[in-house]
Structure formats: structure tokens, C-alpha cells
């Protein structure tokens, strides 16, 4: 059983190495970021809004939002109104479908916007339960070597080491310091 319980900070590193498939397309999660309710960088920090309503629902549901009005971002709702942003996957299944959606094979799932485009995740999945189709999860094998560092693209709580990645993965959105 994949351990999806816990707050965002506990859940984010446990997702590294887990296989995520959406409609049969996906790969291994290699990069995540944690956002807790008491975190000024979290969308839930100032309370519920129509945009972040999924974060105030049940854990293990999707929180999907647009970043800068351009790209969808996919998060897993955690306990205590937090979420884990899935930043990057090592693409393994459905590479041709991913490349067609992305316009080519480069950086298929390296970064939240590229990942959602490759997996065809849109706002239509906001609030969707993650234990039902189109989502499919496979347990990780072994214990991954995880590196931590500061989160990317935020302006608050920038020094928190709440970004987690698979050490040495060529599929990260950005190298760790």
C-alpha cells in the first residue's frame, strides 16, 4: 500500500519513486514540493477560495490550478489542508502520446507545466479522487536516495528545504544546489 497519509511535508518525500499513470500514461515521480497550511507560500495559507477549494477537501484528491494563467499544476491534497506539487516524472509509459501532447520528446515531464501537458491533466480533474481512474499508482521499489533543497518559483518562505528529488535523476525540472 502506498502511504498517502500525513501532512504535505511527510508525504512529499514518500512520493519520490512512486509510479503515477494517468489514463495509462506516466512514469516515476522524481521531484515534489511540499506546501503546508501554515506556509506563507501555500495557496491554503489565507483560507478557502474557489481556486483552492480542493485543498480544503479530503486528502488524496487532486488540486489542479493554473500557474500564471498559462500552465496547469498538479498537486496531491495532503492532511491539514496542505498539498504536494508533483514537479517532475521520469517518463516511462506512453512516451509517444506524451511527445504528441508536448510537441516533441524534449523535457517531456520536467516541470509542473510540462508534466500536466504530457499527462493531459487539466482543471477538469481538480478535486478528483486519486484512487479512481484515470489515476493509477504503483508502489516504489526500494528506498530512493532523496535530495532536498529550496522550492522553485515562489516569493515567500523561499529558504524552506521543502523540495524533494531523486538524487542524480536526469528528469528533474532543475538541479539541486
What function would you assign to each model-found segment?
Residues 1-177:
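Conserved, well-structured core segments that form or line functional sites
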